[in-house]
Amino acid sequence: MLHDVGSINVNWFEAALLGLVQGLTEFLPISSSAHLRIVGSFLPNAADPGAAFTAITQLGTETAVIVYFWRDIVRIVKAWAGTLTRRVPTDDPDARMGWLVILGSLPIIVLGLIFQDQIESVLRSLWIVATMLIVFGLILAVADAVGRQERELTRLTYKHGIFYGFAQAMALIPGVSRSGGTITAGLLMGYTREAAARYSFLLAIPAVFGSGLYQLYKVMSKDGITGPYGLPETALATLIAFVVGYVIIGWFLKFVSTRSYRLFVWYRIFLGLALYLLLGFNVISA
């Protein structure tokens, strides 16, 4: 009995810690899913938190986006809805942004459904995570160095919106980073660091909420969530992710308005190499 109580307490602690990790890393170009996978390997349960846990806790961080940008989002939704009744012209900047978010969300929705089984199994290997951290870290470094960084979101085109969307879809592979992929795409297309980050946050809302609610539906319609953490522990992690994520959004936007992404590039490369060593010496299992 005491052993069972101890196990329950450990699960709550681990879930809270993973919620903190999710909130700290979701909006930074360093891959929150990779960090959940890595940190989970070092915890007493030494288990992958699972795709369902990851997707549901992301509901917390995306709720933080909605709260942080609520004025922008209300304005965009109103203008977009107005185009459906022709009260607002389709070239209205806010209405266009609404359509661009929808358009940019299509690739990750389609590819996520097609490759769902692989995403929840083989692609969660830490060998793949380590490789993606390094490879996409180097791509981010190139984009940050060569991007013109002169375009604002008012100049976002539908073609660029699709390109953003496919970059976001790459984040279905843990280690790529959803924000990292979309920010990299924005820099390569000449957008400023802050503009690339802002659109990245808005673009994530439909896809992440769709994925999280789908996983939540699967959990509620079956016996429960798979993995070491039950629904109550996952709810705690989601709440913590929301609070921490809200703070990180403001800090990150301020940071990238005056500095480069070099810090995150070096961090990704260091973490990827460290992960290779840990896996190679069997300190953790893939």
From Swiss-Prot:
The organism's place on the tree of life at top rank: Bacteria
Recorded catalytic activity of this chain's protein: di-trans,octa-cis-undecaprenyl diphosphate + H2O = di-trans,octa-cis-undecaprenyl phosphate + phosphate + H(+)
A GO CC annotation given for this chain: plasma membrane
Catalytic activity, EC: 3.6.1.27
Flavoprotein found in the keyword field: no
Keywords on record: Antibiotic resistance, Cell membrane, Cell shape, Cell wall biogenesis/degradation, Hydrolase, Membrane, Peptidoglycan synthesis, Transmembrane, Transmembrane helix
Pfam families (UniProt xref): BacA (PF02673)
Membrane topology summary: Multi-pass membrane protein
GO molecular function: undecaprenyl-diphosphatase activity
Main localisation: membrane
GO BP, sorted A to Z: cell wall organization; peptidoglycan biosynthetic process; regulation of cell shape; response to antibiotic
First-tier enzyme category under EC: hydrolase
Transmembrane feature ranges: 50-70, 97-117, 126-146, 156-176, 200-220, 236-256, 264-284
UniProt subcellular location: Cell membrane
NCBIfam families: PRK00281.2-1, undec_PP_bacA
Function: Catalyzes the dephosphorylation of undecaprenyl diphosphate (UPP). Confers resistance to bacitracin.
Family to which the UniProt record says this protein belongs: Belongs to the UppP family.
Misc: Bacitracin is thought to be involved in the inhibition of peptidoglycan synthesis by sequestering undecaprenyl diphosphate, thereby reducing the pool of lipid carrier available.
Protein name: Undecaprenyl-diphosphatase
Gene name per UniProt: uppP
